[in-house]
Amino acid sequence: METNSEGSGGGGRWRFALLALVLIPFLPEIAIWLVSFGAQLGGCEPSANAPCHLGPLAASALIRGALRAGSMVAIGFSFGLSAVWLALCYLAIVRGWRRRWSRILLALATSLPLAVLPYFGPMLSISPLVNAECHPNEGGIPPWCRIYGGDVGDPAHEAVRIGWNVFIGAPVALVAFLVFVVALLVAGRRTSPQQGERVSG
């Protein structure tokens, strides 16, 4: 039997947990966008030769660190972390929502971005910053990539190469979603007869 009301009370905490779980893997990309926004507010251009600083820190150093973090997330997700992460998301969905189809649709909406974006997020985050001195590519040629007056070469080129990991990570996420849906439907079928027996009794 389908429940008509969504979770309340503690459900709000689980919904917030789901939002956090979806956003956390993309913190490196969010950081790059924020650094770029701050740099441009300060009058800096991505193609500038002079170093651009946000307070005591160079914008290029912040971007380089965020790119490395994004690549680490992508590597982790492509080798099984995505399944663990999605399991946590599914737990939050089950605890935060009661309707079966709400759970399935939310699981799909969560699984799709986590199946693809971790591998392309680093590359997409620096694509607006590409300039005459920075052309990220798989071959890493030329080895340098200057953004806001600093070299982010190796991490920028790795951001392009890491996209291939989607062919490992995406199937893992798809299998995790299918397992969740099957488990949800099986659990629903087991619950319905029990509820029917209680009503008739």
Describe each PLM feature range:
Residues 37-65, 69, 133-161:
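Long, glycine/tryptophan/cysteine-rich extracytoplasmic
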Residues 12-23, 75-98, 167-192:
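Transmembrane alpha-helical segments in integral membrane proteins
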Residues 143-201:
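Terminal transmembrane helical module of multi-pass membrane proteins
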Residues 18-41, 108-132:
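Hydrophobic alpha-helical membrane-insertion segments
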Residues 95-109:
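Membrane-interfacial entry segments at the cytosolic side of transmembrane helices
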Residues 60-84, 154-173:
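Individual transmembrane alpha-helix segments
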Residues 1-10:
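Short, Lys/Arg-rich, polar N-terminal cytosolic tail immediately upstream
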Residues 37-44, 94-98, 131-135, 188-193:
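Transmembrane helix-loop junctions in multipass membrane proteins, especially transporters and channels
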